[in-house]
Every structure is written in structure tokens, then in C-alpha cells.
Amino acid sequence: MSTVTITDLARENVRNLTPYQSARRLGGNGDVWLNANEYPTAVEFQLTQQTLNRYPECQPKAVIENYAQYAGVKPEQVLVSRGADEGIELLIRAFCEPGKDAILYCPPTYGMYSVSAETIGVECRTVPTLDNWQLDLQGISDKLDGVKVVYVCSPNNPTGQLINPQDFRTLLELTRGKAIVVADEAYIEFCPQASLAGWLAEYPHLAILRTLSKAFALAGLRCGFTLANEEVINLLMKVIAPYPLSTPVADIAAQALSPQGIVAMRERVAQIIAEREYLIAALKEIPCVEQVFDSETNYILARFKASSAVFKSLWDQGIILRDQNKQPSLSGCLRITVGTREESQRVIDALRAEQV
């Protein structure tokens, strides 16, 4: 009699799945954590809601209204979820038939688009970006047949640059009546002028992902948003869990999105941008650094001589960066989160000491 293991009982695509390697999963014993694009210091909040014996609202009114006002959209165009990662998955679950439809994304980019699709059993198609990391519109057009959701990260993680807005318009015209285009704006607070939120009236098939993890300094809260037209939001509401946000999360999110919270976020952004420019200038003078790429975000991508050795050397000194070597076209590249001035100096001093 054959023995069936628990693993044999699992879905085939899950057995073959490589889980997303988050910064926390990769570990490390550092005291300078510059691998997850988090804000470097904690922000304090006081909990005001004490009704933990009751289930929370499915879509907390104060959070939705505050975010709609901040983003310049209507409350009916906002869905709140457990981080933007849940938004990525909800869009696939709502629009893609497993085993039939596909998603499309353009590497090098964020890794969760493929993981979410593979988990659900939806095909992934890739169209690598051009040499300047802009969209290959002809390549996308050639592969659109059967694609229901297209993910474009702008500013892009891990490269740090914005996607050309005219290319976004072309993509939205190419996909009209065929697919949802998802603009992942996790880092848009660092370049708010580039947001596509004002385009929702023009494009019924546009969805925008946002988060409180970056500029709002609340990565531990797990709170994200999908902005889209009401028809899209209503479909996502059919597949979201009944209570996605716990009461304490909703409480803190509403405070972070108050007028005072927005002012504090913008002050943090200004500070991070100033620190980013300081770090970019310093990196350009370091012998083991071959190239520093422009950034519109809270991280910097740079190409190094002997990048694996540099990565390990800093790791051993407790400075944890994010290795991007395995991403298409990013050979020799490491991503560095912009931290405090003290953390920047630790990185600079360690890199200057590298023998190349």
C-alpha cells in the first residue's frame, strides 16, 4: 500500500512554489537594518479604541475617509487591506481564472506579483524592462492576449525610478476593455507629483496600490490601500476577508492619516530625501562602487565591484543590505535603504574600508 504524505496532498503549484524571500525571512544579526525600505526610527501612537471584545468594521470609516481626503479621491474609491500585498492578491483573485488567465509584470521589479499569482494558480508572463528600466510597450502588447492584470511598480522597487507617464497612458489605452492595470505606488510619498490617482476618472480599469509601511513609518502595522473606481472596489469587497484590519491597526491608521499625521509624514519624507542625497554623493566617491542609480524613493540601488563579497563583509559587520544580483539586469547590484545619518556613515565607512 502506497503511503501518501501530507506534501503529496498539497496542490502541485504550492509544492513547486518558492516563497517570497522577505527581508525578515532572510534574517541576519545586524544592528543597521537597511534591507527592507523601512523608516529607521519608531513613531509613537496611543491607542484610543478599547472595544477589543467586538469585531472591527470591515472597512473602518475613519481610515477610509481620511485616506480618501489625503489621496484626493472619493471614499467609494478606497479599499483598505493588510498591507498593499493583500491588494496585489485580491486583484488576482477577483479578475483571474486559475488555469486560464495570466498576469503580466516587468522585471526587475517587486517579487510579490509572481508569488501571489503562482499561489492562486494563475500564469505569470514577464516582459523585461528596457535598458533604462522603462516599459517595453511593444513587448507588452505582443504578450497581452489572455492577460487580465498588469502590474507596474512606479517608482519601481528595486531600481528607484519612475515610469514615464506617457508610457503609462499608452499601456492604459492598450489594455482598455481587456485588463486591469495596477500602478504600485508604495513609494509615491517620496515623489507625490507622479501619482496616477488623478487619472481614475479617465481609466475605469486603473487600480493603484498604496501603503503606510514606507513614508508613514508603519511597516509593522500592515496597512495598505487600493484606489480604483467603485466598480473595481465592489468586486474586491467580494473576495476580501470579513475583518481585514484589527481594531488597533484601524485606530493607529486613522491617527496617522489625520492632518497632523500627514504633516509629520511630509517632514519625514523631506528628511529622508536630504539623507538620500547625502548618501548618493558619498557612494559616488567610494572605490568599490561602480555606479549609483538615481532614486525617487527611500532607497538607493548601486552596482559594486565584487558585490557578493561586499554584501557579506557588511553583513558580518552587522550592516544588512538587500542583494539584487539575481534580478534580471541587476548583476552586481545591492539596494540600500536610506536610514539615519549615523547608519549612512556606518555604510560609508564600511565601504571605504573594502579592498578592491
Curated annotation (Swiss-Prot):
Keywords: Amino-acid biosynthesis, Aminotransferase, Histidine biosynthesis, Pyridoxal phosphate, Transferase. It comes from Escherichia coli (strain K12). One of its GO terms (molecular function) is pyridoxal phosphate binding. GO terms for cellular component: cytosol. Its EC number is 2.6.1.9. The gene is hisC. InterPro entries: Aminotrans_II_pyridoxalP_BS (IPR001917), Aminotransferase_I/II_large (IPR004839), HisP_aminotrans (IPR005861), PyrdxlP-dep_Trfase (IPR015424), PyrdxlP-dep_Trfase_major (IPR015421), PyrdxlP-dep_Trfase_small (IPR015422). Homodimer. This is Histidinol-phosphate aminotransferase. GO terms for biological process: L-histidine biosynthetic process. It is an enzyme of class 2 (transferase).
